[in-house]
Design a protein with these regions (language model features):
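A detector for small-residue-rich transmembrane helices and their helix-helix packing motifs
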Residues: 2-207
């Protein structure tokens, strides 16, 4: 092989490496895509798909869609601003957590958060239509604070994040009137904290 041939091959390899895209976080990227599709459908249908599939509220237990909405509500968003606020945080925090805990564990955290927050809203707030990934966002935030867990004890970062976060939600729930479900944030954070503790303890027990 001549020098020129090697040079051409080297350039081709460099081009392939330069433009290579890594699908590094299938659960988080898949979640973001589903949320985007749900948002577009909601905008096209004037919110009817959100009411049908992507929000949770008190409805008949005989309706099969009621059970789909227990999970589906985390994919729905009221508009682009609502969507971007949640998805940007998920795309920043989520891939690091998926790399640390694995795709199946992170998927379990997301589904557990959806079920806990969905059932809580269904049972406690019959007149509230809940939608959005904010519960998942706070679950991932609290889960990320457990990344430093070791055999010496609970990391100080978790204590600080939990105290500031829970304090903020309690304050907003008492003194601030808005359309955000503070209970959803708190429950999502508790799910993330609880599962983060369990997942890290299991990981430590292997060593």
């Amino acid at each position: 092989m001549s020098y020129n041939d090697r040079k051409v091959i080297g350039r081709c390899v460099m081009k392939e490496q330069r433009f290579k895209v890594s699908f590094n976080s299938p659960v988080i990227l898949g979640f973001a895509v589903i949320c985007l599709i749900a948002l577009i459908l909601g905008l096209i249908t004037g919110g009817r798909t959100n009411t049908m599939l992507f929000s949770v509220y008190r409805s008949s237990m005989l309706n099969p869609l009621t059970y789909i909405r227990f999970v589906g509500h985390i994919f729905g968003h009221a508009g682009w601003e609502h969507f971007m606020g949640n998805i940007m945080l998920i795309l920043v925090v989520g891939p690091l957590l998926e790399e640390k805990y694995g795709s199946s564990n992170l998927l379990f955290v997301i589904l557990a958060t959806a079920l806990v927050t969905g059932i809580a809203n269904f049972a406690l707030f019959p007149r509230v239509q809940l939608l959005g990934a904010s519960g998942v966002v706070f679950a991932l935030i609290l889960l990320s604070s457990f990344t430093g867990l070791n055999e010496d004890g609970i990391p100080l970062t978790f204590i600080l994040v939990a105290a500031l976060y829970i304090g903020q939600q309690i304050y907003q729930g008492i003194f601030v009137n808005d359309n955000v479900s503070n209970l959803t944030h708190i429950l999502g954070g508790l799910v993330g904290a609880g599962l983060g503790y369990v997942l890290n303890k299991k990981k430590l027990s292997r060593y």
